[in-house]
Regions:
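A short, well-structured edge-of-sheet supersecondary motif
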Residues: 1-22
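Active-site SXXK
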Residues: 17, 30-53, 173
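Short amphipathic alpha-helical segments at helix-loop
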Residues: 22-23, 155
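A short acidic/small-residue loop/turn micro-motif
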Residues: 26-28
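Catalytic-loop motifs flanking and including active-site residues across diverse enzymes
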Residues: 33-35, 39, 81-88, 133, ...
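Active-site-adjacent helix/loop patches that line small-molecule binding or acyl-intermediate pockets
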Residues: 43-160
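Long, repeat-rich segments with strong aromatic
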Residues: 160-177
């Protein structure tokens, strides 16, 4: 279901790792683009920084997160925090089927020390059903040879964006980085 607009929580982790939270700390929400940094970490861990950034940029951009004009102009995504780059990033994580997603989920659980974290099936299915722009980016990159796998890789991206966390989990992720 949808998150209540009235729900609010605030969590911080101090320099000693102590978590302080107030508000609706048990309310879960999906990570969406926050998951991109975790997938990037897994991809770099497996492949090395040079291999990951061989086919995408790493500089900031003033373009919207779902911009993919650079794929037509330069032939590669602007950076891993934009959707095209994030889709390419998850395609670099080794394994078939949902293995890449499971690695991202495992890393989120490790960082947060919360093995109960999972993804929202409803949000995943909605993203999969309506993610035409992302699907277009996937196929442009597949057509140009940046991506060699199947649409399972795109599904992994939709699933990673659907991982549900709480404000405390997110504060722990911020503390980790």
């Amino acid at each position: 279901g949808k998150m209540s607009a009235e729900a609010i929580a605030f969590s911080v982790v101090d320099a000693n790792g102590k978590v302080v939270s107030v508000g609706d700390t048990d309310k879960k929400f999906t990570m969406q683009s926050i998951s991109k940094i975790i997938a990037l970490m897994v991809a770099v861990q497996e492949n090395g920084e040079e291999a990951v950034f061989k086919n995408m940029g790493y500089f900031g951009s003033d373009k919207p997160f779902n911009h993919f004009g650079s794929l037509e102009i330069t032939g590669k995504p602007l950076n891993p925090m934009m959707n095209a780059g994030a889709i390419l990033t998850v395609s670099l994580i080794e394994g078939d089927g949902e293995t890449a997603f499971q690695k991202v989920l495992k890393m989120v659980r490790f960082i947060t020390k919360n093995n109960n974290i999972n993804y929202s099936e409803a949000v995943y299915l909605s993203e999969k059903e309506t993610g035409h722009r992302n699907r277009g980016m996937f196929y442009i990159m597949k057509n140009s040879g940046l991506i060699n796998g199947t649409e399972d890789q795109l599904d992994n991206y939709f699933k990673q964006c659907s991982i549900e966390v709480t404000a405390e989990d997110l504060a722990k992720i911020g503390y980790f980085f």
